[in-house]
Amino acid sequence: MLQLKDGLSLKSQLSLVFYHTVVLLLLTQSCGGQPQVIGPLRLTVSIVGDDIILPCHLEPATDAAAMTIEWLRPDLDPIFVHVRHHGQEILINKHLSYEGRTSLFIDKLKHGDISLKLSKVKLSDEGKYRCFIPSLDRQSIIELVVGAVSSPVISLAGLNKASSGVVLGCESKGWYPEPEVFWLDGEGNILSAGPTETVRGPDGLYTVSSRVTVEKTDTNRFTCRVQQQNINQTRETHIHVP
């Protein structure tokens, strides 16, 4: 039998080429033959009470108007957040907490945009959502992080007799996740303050409070800043001490 330089017979090499060709065709059909369901690369963040869009689209852009589109949360029972079938929303088995708060952009479906609009976001909406097209057997996971914020309130808490300084108090209610509290002087420098007191209410929201003793400065202007880095939110209040 004819042998090639690498020691394989011509028949063996032809078989190997045929095998690789078949594998390539299968990969092309499975990956390139159907559109993919694409979600965002980063977390989607919303504040309680806001409207939010959970991004999801077909790539390449494909008309999804006639497709069944399912938005799900696997951790819920029932798991269905929004289902569109035969051009209509299916309300059977939709989770009660999402009734009247979800919608698709009907005019954008023909361009492959299957994003979900979620109105009046609740704290309980936080979680992982699945954007799923059954006919394509394709899906994408979109994670929603929900936050709650409020502006802090500063009060004159008293006098420090030992240092003749003024004690300032700061409180901010209704935060989620748990925030940090900072005191700043008129130049923006962080002041040394006592430990932050944190209380979590039955609604899951946090109340934080802090005290600081300040001395007179050129401006006598001080700031209480409350921030939560995970949701990229900051609230602050200023006070001028006479």
How should each PLM-predicted stretch be described?
Residues 1-48, 144:
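N-terminal Sec-dependent signal peptide, specifically the hydrophobic helical h-region
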Residues 34-40, 148-158:
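Proline-enriched interdomain boundary motifs that mark the N-terminal boundary
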Residues 51, 124-126, 165, 217-221:
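Extracellular Ig-like/FN3 beta-sandwich strand-entry sites
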Residues 51-57, 68, 99-144:
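Ligand-binding face of N-terminal immunoglobulin V-set domains in extracellular IgSF glycoproteins
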Residues 53-59, 167-173:
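Short edge beta-strand/loop segments characteristic of extracellular beta-sandwich folds
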Residues 56, 71, 129-131, 144, ...:
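Core motif of extracellular immunoglobulin-like domains
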Residues 59-101, 176-195, 223:
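N-terminal V-set
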Residues 63, 124, 129-149, 221-242:
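Extracellular/luminal immunoglobulin-like beta-sandwich modules
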